[in-house]
Design a protein with these regions (language model features):
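Flexible, polar/low-complexity N-terminal or interdomain linker segments that lie immediately upstream
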Residues: 2-57, 64-66, 142
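Short active-site oxyanion
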Residues: 52-58, 73-74, 120-121
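Short, glycine/acidic-enriched loop or turn micro-motifs at the edges of active sites
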Residues: 63, 82
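Solvent-exposed coil/turn segments that connect beta secondary-structure elements
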Residues: 64, 100-102, 137
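Mid-length scaffold segments of soluble, non-membrane domains
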Residues: 67-71
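Short acidic-hydrophobic, aromatic-tinged amphipathic segments that line or gate anion-handling sites
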Residues: 76-79
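Catalytic cysteine-centered active loop of the rhodanese-like fold, especially the PTP/DSP P-loop
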Residues: 83-132
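Short, low-complexity, Pro/Ser/Thr/Gly-rich segments in the mature regions of secreted, periplasmic
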Residues: 133-141
């Protein structure tokens, strides 16, 4: 019985040691990327209020397949090569970027790229078009 307890204890110690050794997966740990430019995140409610306001640009950064399922009325499909030409001339114009949902990062990437060009009033709506449609808000299909 004591032999079994010793073997179990030794196995437990080896497992705990292995977990500690393998925690870094054999590579050096690197710090997470810190971005200097981050858009302000808005809720669906804020997005809806801005949409009703009317003088706000909405940019859909989804794939063509997701865009074809539906988009926010008046939103511009942004996932194109000539996206810079779609931007307003006024660098202070209010713009909302969205993609599919909170798991999609395309709208954050697009918003940061726009901010690099000097645009100052850039917003991102993390809930995206899926959140918009699931909450019963109006949408259009092409």
């Amino acid at each position: 019985m004591t032999k079994l307890i010793k073997q179990l204890f030794a196995s437990l110690v080896l497992l705990m040691t292995a977990n500690t050794c393998l925690a870094g997966a054999g590579g050096d740990l690197t710090p997470a990327v810190q971005h200097d430019l981050n858009p302000r995140y808005i809720s669906l409610l804020e997005g809806e209020a801005l949409h009703k306001q009317g003088d706000v640009y909405f940019f859909d950064v989804n794939t063509l397949e997701i865009w074809a399922e539906g988009f926010i009325p008046g939103a511009v499909f942004f996932n194109v090569k000539g996206w810079r030409e779609l931007l307003p001339k006024n660098k202070d114009a209010q713009m909302v970027f969205y993609c599919a949902n909170r798991l999609c990062t395309a709208s954050v990437v697009a918003a940061r790229e726009v901010m690099k060009l000097g645009y100052t009033n850039v917003l991102q709506m993390p809930d995206g078009i899926y959140g918009w449609r699931m909450s019963g808000r109006p949408h259009e299909v092409p």
